[in-house]
């Protein structure tokens, strides 16, 4: 074994500098943070050759006392803390006392500083960690520090520096983050004698965002905030139209400190998930104010990462705040269209006590997926229904709060609300003698017949009692213009033109419906006339075994059929007529790409998303009744504005928008 050597101070300082000072932008970051901690309100940064030749920081902060000038450049000399306990109560940007010692050991450094209580300041010059002189000087209150010839005495580090253009870009980026974090401070970046960035310290975050980005982005922001006992989350998120293909426009600040956090980024992006298209990343500037004892900032040499005491609670707080803000913005955009006061509903809260429960059964109606039988996606072409006895025997449900549904009634878990339409008259006139059989084949797309609901007191009656709709104001001022290209539905309402993507809209309806069935535990399955046998690889079979309960709860009946072979006997009824093998393998592939620790909710959502393949397609010609039914289904949803993949389900043009297009108005 080699002899153990004690390194001299110069060597240890250079090694430490390698951890703290990676590139010129690291110097700018450390020195500007010192200026902020000193209470500066105006900070000027001058650079030459990307900071490799010169970095100069001028601030109007409190300055450094003459007696402390020399000590400021000693390793681990700081005015921020006295003991290790202070780290967990720290509210300043810096605290380790490493920056000045590290910077001065690998550069030529000159510092001038004066405090308000002195008529003169002090100037110190250090070259390669050695003090060349210390003298009195005249200067303004505050501090000016010049760092030149960075890494001049560390050739190994010098040759790995990037181009001056690249380093200038990195410095601009970190200055922009400071502008966002501190809207009340004026920052001025001068590159090669020319002003590059200028902020005015107005204290308005939106002004800072406009300064850093542009007018378009500043005009497409959504404000959000959430305040809890120990944490406040607030800031701005961008509307979907300003999303980008990279994460460069994302900023996270914890107690005003710019940090990078995968889990905070994930919380925001998950909140955006159903509002953005695939591979698009949202714009956001998010601030997290939290008591210092609940975070640890001493986990990275550059303090660019933090640890939270309770990441789960943090994730939920951020997710909820962002998600509600997005939903609120979209809801406001379509207020006139989705005015649910216009929808006539029957609130059955008073009759909840009259309901009883049934045990869940499986659907016993086999459906041949290869036949030409078609199910009307909106359930309008079924002439006759099975008897009450048959319904109770054949349809598996968990709730026995039964009303005839025919895909036109909806129930809310919290406050049972039944939605009815003009089929009510027909249903009320039916008695069980008419329910002998279904004479017509089921039409295309009724892939999700809802559970039927009967009133407890009428299950033995010869008719089904349904609360009758006396009026429905929703359609009074709504005009269905028709379809464009058999893909987009055109609707006029309240002097506004709505264009609905029929595929995206129906996709969202099916997604929410299937997801709701999974959550409530009564997914209706269909028995396949010919079970589908699939031979899996060992890896695929292991993924299936790991997620077999997910498949079961989603309406799939799957049995092992050999060492790595499975036999699919039932699939969710909502899927209609899928290619069972392809669908199953698609779901398996999605589950494979998820982490094993992903929650079951995320996995169910993935399955529900794939289930949307049975939605109506572009170029499908819809009747007016079908269009109305699709709109009714959308009205029930909490978030009908985007499909499961993040595409918009509709867009709106006001009369003013159209008149501007035709140059009728300015």
Swiss-Prot record:
Output the superkingdom of the source species.
Bacteria
Q: Which family does it belong to?
A: Belongs to the DNA mismatch repair MutL/HexB family.
PANTHER family tied to this protein? DNA MISMATCH REPAIR PROTEIN MLH, PMS, MUTL (PTHR10073), DNA MISMATCH REPAIR PROTEIN MLH1 (PTHR10073:SF12)
CDD domains per the record? HATPase_MutL-MLH-PMS-like, MutL_Trans
Pfam families the record matches: DNA_mis_repair, HATPase_c_3, MutL_C
Q: What does this protein do?
A: This protein is involved in the repair of mismatches in DNA. It is required for dam-dependent methyl-directed DNA mismatch repair. May act as a 'molecular matchmaker', a protein that promotes the formation of a stable complex between two or more DNA-binding proteins in an ATP-dependent manner without itself being part of a final effector complex.
What is the native source organism of this protein? Answer: Clostridium botulinum (strain Loch Maree / Type A3)
The UniProt record lists the keyword DNA damage: yes
- Return the protein name: DNA mismatch repair protein MutL
One GO cellular component term of this record is: mismatch repair complex
Q: GO biological process annotations for this chain's record?
A: mismatch repair
Keywords (A to Z) from UniProt: DNA damage, DNA repair
Which GO molecular-function terms appear in the entry? ATP binding; ATP hydrolysis activity; ATP-dependent DNA damage sensor activity; mismatched DNA binding
KW DNA repair (keyword) present: yes
Alphabetized Gene3D superfamilies for the sequence: 3.30.230.10, Histidine kinase-like ATPase, C-terminal domain, MutL, C-terminal domain, dimerisation subdomain, MutL, C-terminal domain, regulatory subdomain
